Amino acid sequence: ETKDINKQEYLLRIKKVTDYIHQNIDQPLSLQKMAGIACFSPFHFHRVFTILTGETPTDYIKRTRIEKAALLLKQNKELSATEIAALCGFSSLSLLSRNFRLHFSMTIREFRSLK
């Protein structure tokens, strides 16, 4: 039962971090900051986050940024890809483009032209 309580506590702490990531996706997100939110050391946070989410914090952030970019590309045709890159926390359009192509196996332009 203590193990279940600990897991629930850990899940709540990681949920606080994922909420923070989603609310601040346009900002730089450091391991130290996220570990602090979860009240873990950076090493322990990385371990717990990866076990509970199935992704490293870095991979989770990258995927969340790309998914937000895809949503904005579809919903806001008036926003440029450069503006979307900034809104999603990518430091440049080329970084968004490279990650987008790796994730979706198509370019931003190809994605935007899909019906």
Give residue ranges: language-model regions:
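Conserved short alpha-helical interface segments
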Residues: 100-115
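Key DNA-contact positions within bacterial/archaeal DNA-binding proteins
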Residues: 43, 93-94, 109
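Short, basic interhelical loop/turn and adjoining N-cap
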Residues: 37, 89-95
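An amphipathic alpha-helical interaction segment
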Residues: 1-23, 32-33, 38, 42-44
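Intrinsically disordered, low-complexity sequence elements enriched in Ser/Thr/Gly/Pro
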Residues: 11, 60-63, 96, 110
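Terminal helix-turn-helix DNA-binding modules in bacterial transcription factors
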Residues: 14-32, 51-91, 114-115
